[in-house]
Structure formats: structure tokens, C-alpha cells
Amino acid sequence: QSIGACSGTIVAGAIFTLPAIYILQAKYPEMSVSFVKVFMSSLLGGILGILFMIPFRKYFVKDMHGKYPFPEATATTQVLVSGAKGGSQAKPLLIAGLIGGLYDFIVATVYWWNECFTSRVVEWGAVAADKAKLVFKVNTGAAVLGLGYIIGLKYAFIICLGSFAVWWLIVPGMSMLFHDQVLNIWNPEITQTVGAMSAEQIFKYYGKSIGIGGIAMAGIIGIIKSWGIIKGAVSLAANEMKGGAQASADTVRTQRDLPFKFIAIASIATLLITFIFFWFGVMEGNLLFAVVGILLVTVIAFLFTTVAGNAIAIVGSNPVSGMTLMTLILASVVLVAVGLKGTGGMVAALIMGGVVCTALSMAGGF
């Protein structure tokens, strides 16, 4: 299971940042990045993600047992348990799989109806969407229905409230407040006024950006709320490093972690290799830029590890894209402040973002 998940998390970590390098090459032909740099950023980020997550395993898996739904892990466990018992226990699993597969085949392949129901299909809904920018949408996919069942009513309700806030408050609100204005400071390709856009366009150009900002702020709040967890994990590591409590021989194997001494040594070694990679492979021998880069990567990756863990434990989805965008913004501002600009600065920020993004994706995946 871990081997299968590992490939997906590595790809998820790299896909948000590294393709941007090749997209920018169309505008800046002098920008070039070798495959080795792309490979190293994913490799080092993946190792850091695993090492940073281990100290928090006990908190998420043991201390918070029964309090977090862990939707994806719960679904996987139920499949394994039902399959192991066989007979009558496996029968509902097989029936559910057949029903879900048949339903998705009818919707996604045969197209008997649209997977995403929208109020635009009725006359009054189309009028409300065009005039007031009010749209009601429901994704009827079997996977979404199953996710809602797994995470429970509380967290499903919170997710729905977020959707309502975007589609029924932010989208029509922006149309009312900025009806005759062209808001294109961050995207010069936008030429329409907000009022001339459809509700879907307002969501695409502005609603998503506001949501990403919300994720970034939630990440900061998550770090603040998780500060006690972070201190506890660091204190436990320091205590063991000094020769404190060790795992008892009677401790169940599945409750044992790698020794903190090993984690500390491996983390330091990985960070040292990352620093050398930044120094000679990304920053072209500039020591100051390399030091700033490794400090940013270390602090952001470690602090956001708890946020990734919380997100996976609650909704089963890792908001790694929002946290990566925040990393890119911080990295760009800091690197420009210390003097790294131009295409070199773009490549450096994206490589650093790739390391952090892969680390967070790997931490959430495991």
C-alpha cells in the first residue's frame, strides 16, 4: 500500500511546481533546468516529508484515535478487513463496488446525465445565474457521495458551508461590488469587467484565488493551533536524544517508531545534501542564497507538516497546492530581498517550492 501510494504522492508534489519551469521557458528561452535537478528536488522533498512526519505519528494515530475520521485510511482499512473475513463480510463490499462502478460508467462514459447538476438547467436558474450570478451546483459522483459518508456529517457540513460561501456570497458579492471594474492586476489576460463575466468565470478568476488565500491563512492558523503538538514532538525527540524514555521490549511492533537519533541524523544529513544541492545546483555557488533557501525550506516544510496531517485526518485531501503557493510567494519575496532576481530567481523559487511541495505531499500521504 505504501509503495503504491508513494508514487502518487511524489507526482502530486512535483506536478504543482516543476511544470511551471517548462512553461516559463516559452517566454524566457534562456531558462533551463536539467532532469537531475527536477529529480533531486522530488527525491529530497520526499525523504524530508517522511522524516518530518514520523515524530507526529503517535499524536495523529494514537492520541487522536477516534477523534479524526481519516476518510481514505478508513476506507482502505474497511476494504482490507472485509476482504480478509470473506464470505458475508465481503459481499456488501462487492455489491457496493459493482453499484458504484456501474453508476460511474453510466454517468462518466455513457453520459446518461451530467455528473454535475446545475440550476442553469431550469429557466429561473439560468436567469438567476445571468442576472444575480447565483448558481446552485451538486456533484453527483459516487466517489463524492462515498467521501461524505466516510468523513461524517460534521466535516461534510463544514465543506458545504465553504462551497456556499464561495458560490452564494463571494461570487455574487464581487459582481455587485466591482460590477463595472476590470480586476486584472494579477492576471493581465482578464479584459472583461466583473459584471460581464459569468458566475463560473468569477469563480475561476477570483473565487479560487480567495480560496487559496483562505487555505494559506488556515495553514497559518493550523500552525498556531498545532504549536503544542510541535513542541511536544520536539520535546519527546530531545528527551530521547538525551537518553530518556526508550521503547519497551513489550511494546507492540506497530506502535514503535524509528529511533529519534536515527531520525535526527537522517534529517540533518538530508538537509545538508539539500543545502549542497541548492548551493551548487540551483544558486550557482552563491552561499548567501543557498543559506536563505535551506532555511526557508526547513522551516516551512516542518511547520506545514502538521497542517498536511490535519487535513488528511479530517477530509482526506491534502491542501498542498495552497501551501505550495504560499511557499512560492514567501520564497520569491525573500529571495528578491537578498538580491536573487531574474530567471535564476524564478528557477530557484520553483525548485524550492518543488522540495517543499513534495515533502508536504509525502507527509500527508503517509
Task: Enumerate the language-model features and the residues they cover.
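Alpha-helical multipass membrane-protein architecture
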Residues: 1-366
